[in-house]
């Protein structure tokens, strides 16, 4: 609402977190999409030619960038980020970099913020929060880093009406960052082991499924299109046929997501195993009937 007028557009990479689309729709702004390129091993890459073509649209005003990317789990390399940044700067666009998953990366890796490669670009806004890292979404607390002084002042005025910080949320966030380090490292190790468990299960029980272990997030992005080619609504199928609630498909992830499901692996491994076994049984039953 603050950055875009009614005839201007925002750009998303797809698949995309659905609430990026919802935010644009709420503000009455049209959306451009640039599909990520899918590779045979399940990984994704930026289609730089398409991305630049969309940025060059005279109506494009803002890029929603997700780093690390949700739902694919990509941690963009410094080279990728620099190429994206160069395109954004060439067309003088605003960029909102959603980095909420930046703490939830595989052990031994290091997050590269967009701010590192756009060190002096004034139209960068970075969004982070303790809520994913420490499972504190109920705090409704986040860190919004706005470089442009005029925009920051406008945001602060708007914040007086819609975003007053709860003192308890602020205290909880400070405590999490100050004292949660050891817990956070143990969490990352457990998540890494969960991803390895799911990867091995799928390779053994559902070899048609395509999944790679993402560099970041606690979310597995799994291609089940070869397992269930005739099922159009995978979340509905698994809810009703397996008793498993999950997310997937274009309805939530905007586009470029047909045949995919997103699995939350931030839970005890025994629960993950039960869910996977239910999914396997439902898939095998569906395959046998068709």
Residue ranges, per PLM feature:
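Substrate-binding/gating loop at the entrance of the active-site cleft, primarily
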Residues: 1, 12-31
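Phosphate-binding glycine-rich loop
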Residues: 1-9, 228
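PLP-dependent enzyme catalytic core of the Aspartate aminotransferase-like
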Residues: 11, 53, 237-245, 252-290
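Helix C-cap/helix->beta junction micro-motif
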Residues: 27, 58, 90-91, 242, ...
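Active-site phosphate-binding strand-loop segment of PLP-dependent enzymes
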Residues: 38-106
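Active-site PLP attachment segment
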Residues: 117-153, 166, 259
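Structural signature of PLP-dependent enzymes
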Residues: 153-159, 176-199, 231
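Conserved glycine-rich beta-strand-loop-beta hairpin in the small C-terminal domain of fold type I
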Residues: 174, 191-199, 211-224
């Amino acid at each position: 609402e603050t950055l875009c007028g009614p005839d201007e557009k925002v750009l998303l990479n797809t698949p995309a977190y659905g609430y990026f689309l919802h935010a644009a729709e709420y503000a009455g702004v049209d959306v451009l999409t640039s599909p990520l390129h899918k590779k045979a091993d399940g990984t994704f890459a930026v289609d730089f030619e398409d991305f630049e073509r969309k940025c060059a649209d005279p109506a494009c005003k803002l890029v929603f960038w997700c780093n690390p990317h949700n739902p694919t789990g990509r941690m963009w390399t410094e080279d990728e980020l620099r190429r994206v940044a160069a395109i954004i700067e060439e067309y003088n666009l605003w960029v909102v970099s959603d980095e909420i998953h930046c703490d939830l990366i595989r052990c031994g890796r290091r997050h590269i913020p967009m701010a590192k490669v756009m060190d002096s670009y004034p139209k960068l806004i970075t969004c982070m929060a303790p809520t994913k890292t420490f499972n504190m979404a109920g705090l409704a607390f986040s860190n919004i880093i706005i470089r442009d002084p005029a925009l920051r002042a406008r945001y602060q005025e708007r914040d007086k009406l819609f975003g007053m910080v709860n003192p308890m949320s602020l205290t909880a966030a400070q405590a999490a960052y100050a004292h949660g380090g050891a817990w956070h490292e143990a969490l990352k190790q457990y998540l890494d082991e969960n991803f390895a468990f799911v990867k091995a299960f799928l390779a053994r029980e559902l070899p048609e499924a395509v999944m790679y272990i993402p560099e970041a997030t606690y979310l597995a992005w799994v291609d089940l299109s070869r397992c269930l080619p005739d099922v159009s609504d995978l979340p509905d199928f698994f809810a009703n046929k397996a008793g498993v609630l999950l997310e997937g498909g274009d309805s939530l992830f905007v586009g470029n997501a047909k045949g995919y499901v997103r699995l939350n692996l931030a839970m005890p491994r025994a629960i993950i195993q039960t869910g996977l076994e239910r999914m396997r049984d439902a898939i095998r039953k569906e395959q046998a009937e068709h």
